[in-house]
């Protein structure tokens, strides 16, 4: 079912990991953990497991950027299968909210990314039509979407020779929220030319041409929308809805009745409590929405009535992407130590915001049922699961152990307390598969413990050694003040150093790391250098100051993650400055010793020569930023010198291309540049909008 394409075969620890994980899935283990060191090929290992078990697979990552990277990797491994991408389709999103203290209501404000919306619809279509599906998703997959039953009821299967009139087919298309447009042929549109109907499916790149002869479908053709050229003839095809939230007319009419009933009850409650303002507010807002639903079939914020539309009882869980998978699907949670807690925290944040809206008459109580899954509901939706992480949390290890020992798990298992401890190298925990030996032959960095006294002088000497070899150094401190003072001191004695602090935005942070890789400076000082994206093959030394101060930044997990920043260099080394051998340091040293011994023995046995990771430096995001500033400057100095309209068109094309390539930072910068040009074209003053929730500004999601 799955055809894995790769220019290399499993190597190092990958073959045994693939075999064990595959055996676990086939034997019915509900929870397994893949504990893999940095650079061990965890994604390739999971890809081989997917190929072996032949199950539809959902891969969850904790942010869009990492999800995009995983999507690209799986797409390259499975070019002949359906690899889909399911993340939030908002370029920016400001949820509606009310601040009682200032009596401020913030309207919902958002902009959808059409390409990501297409990919989401493509995901749902693939899950309905085939089993060889891999969906890479962010944690937004736990939010509610349309009902699977409604979606399935609305699809239009057609075939050559089917008795179906053109008029009935057109009516069905409109029910699926397609729009007729005989001029522009965009996704979600259809056009009519005599007995021929051309449809642009919302989840596909191509178009469908359906030719009728009387009351019968005579021919179905797939064609290229831009040129109109035929791509292939089809015997049958399924037309899927143009939107994710679709329902039948019968259900919509029923929903309107139940919404009116809830509205009447809510008004009486407010009037009984002498909250006349809230009663008037909820009456006015809800009746306007009902009017729109009766006339147009949709209203702004219709998702807040999803419980009524789908006919769910109060308090029931929402319909999510999980419902579209068959019962035997495989779940993979990437970077599980970060993703699992994020899944657990989303429900409470959403509930607190909506509760305020309900209490003050902006929304009906049923709006609280338009929400993400809570953690127990998520556990109830889990099927067989593989947790992937270099530092899995205690509860993931415990679930995996219980699943392997008892032989049955419980996706509804008791929620264990969070922990940061990783698997001991000497304990073969059942259900936990380790990837220690890298395909490149690289061994874990050597770890040296040095006393705190004289740590700065020693650090300077070590930094200069690396600088002479054109290698880079990361230095992590405990406090912002220490980091700033150390940076100033190193700079004063002639060392080329920069400080990575929390006030740097995402794009500037990427630029700092890029400059480090290019050799524009030699030393990067920071407090928490564990964040995703610190893939720096040029770094040969990681220095951890005050390593014996037990806590979050010096825990076993933090030490392992920080040390991994030097794991891609042939001469990688980690120096811990400490006077006390804390429990975290002892565990970290034990893990490192075990890994190095195993890696070195494997290399000797197989005559492998380790080699550093080589990776090209990505194009600078600052290029796009400087382009925007340059365009703004040109417009200010003389907007008549350029054709603004054509420039906007060019930038829009670039933005769509960037979104299609999943380069969202570039797309966002281009979008902002387009807005600035449009403001100049309209003759309005430019507005600078900072990221702030309270000041009614836009926040990114």
Predicted segments with their positions:
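Conserved RecA-like helicase motor-core motifs
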Residues: 78-88, 301, 434, 472-474, ...
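Intrinsic, low-complexity polybasic segments
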Residues: 402-409, 419
């Amino acid at each position: 079912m799955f055809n894995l394409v790769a220019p290399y075969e499993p190597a190092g620890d990958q073959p045994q990991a693939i075999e064990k994980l595959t055996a676990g899935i086939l034997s019915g283990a509900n929870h397994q953990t893949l504990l893999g060191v940095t650079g061990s090929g965890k994604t390739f290992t999971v890809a081989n497991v997917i190929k072996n078990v032949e199950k539809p697979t959902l891969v969850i990552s904790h942010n869009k950027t990492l999800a995009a990277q995983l999507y690209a990797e799986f797409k390259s491994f499975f070019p002949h299968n359906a690899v889909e991408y399911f993340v939030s389709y908002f370029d920016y999103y400001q949820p509606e909210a009310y601040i009682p203290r200032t009596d401020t209501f913030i309207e919902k404000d958002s902009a959808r990314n059409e390409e990501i919306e297409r990919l989401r619809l493509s995901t749902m279509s693939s899950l309905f039509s085939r089993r060889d599906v891999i969906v890479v998703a962010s944690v937004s997959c736990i939010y509610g979407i349309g009902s699977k039953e409604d979606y399935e009821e609305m699809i239009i299967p057609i075939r050559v020779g089917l008795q179906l009139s053109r008029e009935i087919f057109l009516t069905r298309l409109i029910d699926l929220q397609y729009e007729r447009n005989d001029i522009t042929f965009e996704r979600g549109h259809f056009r009519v030319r005599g007995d021929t109907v051309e449809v642009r499916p919302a989840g596909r790149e191509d178009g469908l041409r359906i030719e009728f002869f009387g009351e019968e479908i005579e021919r179905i053709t797939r064609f290229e929308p831009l040129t109109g050229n035929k791509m292939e003839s089809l015997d049958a095809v399924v037309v899927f809805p143009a939107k994710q939230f679709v329902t039948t007319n019968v259900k919509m009419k029923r929903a309107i009745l139940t919404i009116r009933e809830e509205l009447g009850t809510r008004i009486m409650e407010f009037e009984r409590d002498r909250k006349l303002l809230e009663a008037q507010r909820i009456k006015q807002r809800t009746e306007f929405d009902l009017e729109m639903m009766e006339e147009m079939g949709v209203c702004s914020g219709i998702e807040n009535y999803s419980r009524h539309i789908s006919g769910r009882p109060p308090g029931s869980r929402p319909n999510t992407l999980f419902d579209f998978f068959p019962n035997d699907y495989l779940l993979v949670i990437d970077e599980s130590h970060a993703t699992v807690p994020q899944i657990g925290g989303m429900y409470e944040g959403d509930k607190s915001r909506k509760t305020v809206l309900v209490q003050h008459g902006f929304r009906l109580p049923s709006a609280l049922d338009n929400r993400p899954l809570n953690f127990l509901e998520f556990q109830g939706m889990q099927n067989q699961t593989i947790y992937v992480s270099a530092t899995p949390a205690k509860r993931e290890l415990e679930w995996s152990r219980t699943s392997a020992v008892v032989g049955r798990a419980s996706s509804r298992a008791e929620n264990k307390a969070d922990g940061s401890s990783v698997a001991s190298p000497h304990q073969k925990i059942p259900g936990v598969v380790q990837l220690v030996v890298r395909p490149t032959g690289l061994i874990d960095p050597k770890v040296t413990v040095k006393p705190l006294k004289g740590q700065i002088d020693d650090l300077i000497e070590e930094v200069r050694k690396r600088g002479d070899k054109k290698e880079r150094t990361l230095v992590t401190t405990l406090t912002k003040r220490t980091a700033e003072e150390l940076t100033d001191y190193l700079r004063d004695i002639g060392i080329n150093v920069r400080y990575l602090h929390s006030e740097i935005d995402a794009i500037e942070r990427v630029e700092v790391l890029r400059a480090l890789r290019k050799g524009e400076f030699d030393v990067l000082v920071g407090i928490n250098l564990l964040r995703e994206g610190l893939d720096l093959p040029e770094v040969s030394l990681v220095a951890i100051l005050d390593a014996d101060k037990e806590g979050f930044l010096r825990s076993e997990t933090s030490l392992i993650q920080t040390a991994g920043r030097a794991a891609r260099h042939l001469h990688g080394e980690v120096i811990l400055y400490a006077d006390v051998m804390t429990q975290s340091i002892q565990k970290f040293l034990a893990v490192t010793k075990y890994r190095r011994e195993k890696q070195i023995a494997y290399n000797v046995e197989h005559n492998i020569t380790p080699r550093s990771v080589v990776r090209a430096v990505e194009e600078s995001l600052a290029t796009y930023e400087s382009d925007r500033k340059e365009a703004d400057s040109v417009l200010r100095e003389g907007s008549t010198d350029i054709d603004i309209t054509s420039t906007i068109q060019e930038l829009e094309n670039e933005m769509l291309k960037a979104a299609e390539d999943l380069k969202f930072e570039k797309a966002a910068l281009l979008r902002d540049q387009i807005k600035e040009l449009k403001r100049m074209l309209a003759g309005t003053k430019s507005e600078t909008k900072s990221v702030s929730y309270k000041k009614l500004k836009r926040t990114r999601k």
